């Protein structure tokens, strides 16, 4: 990445921290070198990671709204401004394993616990559409969201390759 594209203070892409950046680390082919991938992962871990998924916007960014509540227009705004999406956790975990390999397994397993706990709360063996971006990370939106369940299953399959 060209230096002028990076924020000097945090060394991240453009001016807000969003989960899109994790795809550049998770995919097989990336324009980033290993050091850049680790920087992206470190920022995502520090600013976006929750026990229920990745936030759609860092709490340090302007316009952060972690609570999916209120009238439809207010919920629509919060949807991309700080709520946590479980399906993004799959790509985050894949990125984490690309950087840390076997030494990252215990961390990934601990992260899955936050999602595993939810499988009996809203809809048996399913996960809600999203969670509030701040504690207590309340499940919101659709009570059962296939994309979230699919990503957890994909990560479990990926983890099985290590055992």
Predicted features, each with a name:
Residues 7-10, 32-152, 159-163:
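Non-catalytic carbohydrate-binding regions of carbohydrate-active enzymes
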Residues 14-34:
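His/Glu-based metal-binding/catalytic segments typifying zinc-dependent metallopeptidases
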Residues 1-13:
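Single conserved hydrophobic/aromatic residue that forms the stacking wall/gate
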Residues 6, 17-22, 87-88:
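Short, solvent-exposed loop/turn segments at the edges of secondary structure
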């Amino acid at each position: 990445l060209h230096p002028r594209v990076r924020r000097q203070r945090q060394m991240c892409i453009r001016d807000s921290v969003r989960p899109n950046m994790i795809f550049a680390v998770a995919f097989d082919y990336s324009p980033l070198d290993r050091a850049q991938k680790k920087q992206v992962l470190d920022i995502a871990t520090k600013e976006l990671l929750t026990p229920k998924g990745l936030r759609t916007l860092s709490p340090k960014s302007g316009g952060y709204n972690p609570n999916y509540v209120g009238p439809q227009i207010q919920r629509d705004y919060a949807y991309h401004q700080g709520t946590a999406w479980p399906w993004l956790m799959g790509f985050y975990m894949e990125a984490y394993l690309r950087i840390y390999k076997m030494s990252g397994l215990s961390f990934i397993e601990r992260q899955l616990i936050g999602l595993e706990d939810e499988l009996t709360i809203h809809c048996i063996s399913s996960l809600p559409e999203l969670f509030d971006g701040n504690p207590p990370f309340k499940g919101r939106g659709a009570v059962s969201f296939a994309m979230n369940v699919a990503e957890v299953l994909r990560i479990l399959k990926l983890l099985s390759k290590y055992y």
